[in-house]
Swiss-Prot record:
The gene is pdxS. It is an enzyme of class 4 (lyase). GO terms for molecular function: pyridoxal 5'-phosphate synthase (glutamine hydrolysing) activity. It catalyses: aldehydo-D-ribose 5-phosphate + D-glyceraldehyde 3-phosphate + L-glutamine = pyridoxal 5'-phosphate + L-glutamate + phosphate + 3 H2O + H(+). In the presence of PdxT, forms a dodecamer of heterodimers. Catalyzes the formation of pyridoxal 5'-phosphate from ribose 5-phosphate (RBP), glyceraldehyde 3-phosphate (G3P) and ammonia. The ammonia is provided by the PdxT subunit. Can also use ribulose 5-phosphate and dihydroxyacetone phosphate as substrates, resulting from enzyme-catalyzed isomerization of RBP and G3P, respectively. Pfam families: SOR_SNZ. Belongs to the PdxS/SNZ family. GO terms for biological process: amino acid metabolic process; pyridoxal phosphate biosynthetic process; pyridoxine biosynthetic process. Pathway: Cofactor biosynthesis; pyridoxal 5'-phosphate biosynthesis. The active site is at 91 (schiff-base intermediate with d-ribose 5-phosphate). InterPro entries: Aldolase_TIM (IPR013785), PdxS/SNZ (IPR001852), PdxS/SNZ_N (IPR033755), RibuloseP-bd_barrel (IPR011060). This is Pyridoxal 5'-phosphate synthase subunit PdxS.
C-alpha cells in the first residue's frame, strides 16, 4: 500500500515589502480621487478611479478653514469602505503612528502619511515597516523619496501643492525627482556613495535607483491637478498615475470632470482624446497662485 505525505499549505505572504509594493503596482496608470462621502466615492468609482482617498475635508477646505487637520472619523472611513469595491486609502498625520494603527485596524487598503494634515512629529516619520498595510508618502525631491522608501513606503507621490488647483508645483517636484534619478545613471560606485550622503539616503537604495533608472516603488503625482490636460501632463512627464484632490468635487460638474480626468490619464499621449475629454466640463475649481502662498501655508514643505 502506498502512502502520500500531505504537505501543509503555505500561508500567503502578508505585509512584506514585495507584497505591499505589488499592491501599489496594481494602481499604475490610474487616478486616485479624494472623497468625503460615500456618494462621492460612488461617483469616483463609476468614473473609473482605481482607488479613493477617504477624508473629512478636501485639501482646499483644509487650507481655507485652517486649524489642526487630523485623521478622519472612523465611521466616515468605514462608510466609504462599505460603499465601493475599489481600494480605499486614508490619511494619517506625519509621525502619528497611532493614527496609522487605527487606520490599519479599520481595514483601509493604503495609508497616506500626508503633509496635508498637520504633522504630529517634527523629527520622525512613522516606521512603515511595522505595518502590514502599505503606505503612500509624498516627496519633493529624490532624497525625500528615498528616505520614505527606507522607512518602508510602498508608493511615492510627488507632492505638488494640494488644494491650490495649480499644477506648477506638481510639475516642479516630479521633474526634480526624475532629473535626479537621471543624474545617478552615469555614476560609478564612489560617486554613488557621495550621492547617498548628499541625498541623506541609504547607499543600497541609491544604487538600486541608479541601476533601475527609476524608483523601486510606484511614482504617482499629486497636488494641483484640476483638468484632464493637467493629468495628461503629469503622465507625459513620467508619473505612473495621478492623485486628484479638490479638483473634482470643487468643480462645476464633478461626475463629468472625474470621468474626463480618468480618460486623459489613460490616453495621456493622444491630444485629440484629451481635447474631447476637456469639452463642456463646467467651471474648474478656483485656483490659487502658489507664488502668493506664505511659507507657513505651503504643505509641500512639511516632512523632511
Amino acid at each position: 500500500m502506498s502512502s502520500t505525505l500531505s504537505v501543509p499549505a503555505q500561508a500567503p505572504e502578508t505585509g512584506t515589502a514585495r507584497v505591499k509594493r505589488g499592491m501599489a503596482e496594481q494602481l499604475k496608470g490610474g487616478v486616485i480621487m479624494d472623497v468625503v462621502t460615500p456618494e462621492q466615492a460612488k461617483i469616483a468609482e463609476d468614473a473609473g478611479a482605481v482607488a479613493v482617498m477617504a477624508l473629512e475635508r478636501v485639501p482646499a477646505d483644509i487650507r481655507k478653514d485652517g486649524g489642526v487637520a487630523r485623521m478622519s472619523d472612523p465611521d466616515m472611513i468605514e462608510g466609504i469602505i462599505s460603499a465601493v469595491s475599489i481600494p480605499v486609502m486614508a490619511k494619517s498625520r506625519i509621525g502619528h503612528f497611532v493614527e496609522a494603527q487605527v487606520l490599519q485596524s479599520l481595514g483601509v487598503d493604503y495609508i497616506d502619511e500626508s503633509e496635508v494634515l498637520t504633522p504630529a512629529d517634527e523629527v520622525n516619520h512613522s516606521d512603515k515597516w511595522a505595518f502590514t498595510t502599505p503606505f503612500v508618502c509624498g516627496a519633493t525631491n529624490l532624497g525625500e523619496a528615498l528616505r520614505r522608501i527606507a522607512e518602508g513606503a510602498a508608493m511615492i507621490r510627488s507632492k505638488g501643492e494640494a488644494g491650490t488647483g495649480n499644477v506648477v508645483e506638481a510639475v516642479r517636484h516630479l521633474r526634480q525627482i526624475k532629473n535626479e534619478i537621471a543624474r545617478l545613471r552615469g555614476y560609478d560606485n564612489n560617486e554613488l556613495y557621495a550621492a547617498a550622503k548628499e541625498l541623506r539616503a541609504p547607499y543600497e537604495i541609491v544604487k538600486e535607483v541608479a541601476e533601475l533608472g527609476k524608483l523601486p516603488v510606484v511614482l504617482f503625482s499629486a497636488g494641483g491637478v484640476a483638468t484632464p490636460a493637467d493629468a495628461a501632463l503629469m503622465r507625459q512627464l513620467g508619473a505612473e498615475g495621478v492623485f486628484v484632490g479638490s479638483g473634482i468635487f470643487k468643480s462645476g460638474d464633478p461626475a463629468k470632470r472625474a470621468a474626463a480626468i480618468v480618460k486623459a490619464t489613460t490616453f495621456y499621449d493622444d491630444p485629440k482624446i484629451i481635447a474631447d475629454a476637456s469639452r463642456n466640463l463646467g467651471e474648474a475649481m478656483v485656483g490659487i497662485n502658489c507664488d502668493t502662498l506664505p511659507e507657513a501655508e505651503r504643505y509641500a514643505n512639511r516632512g523632511w
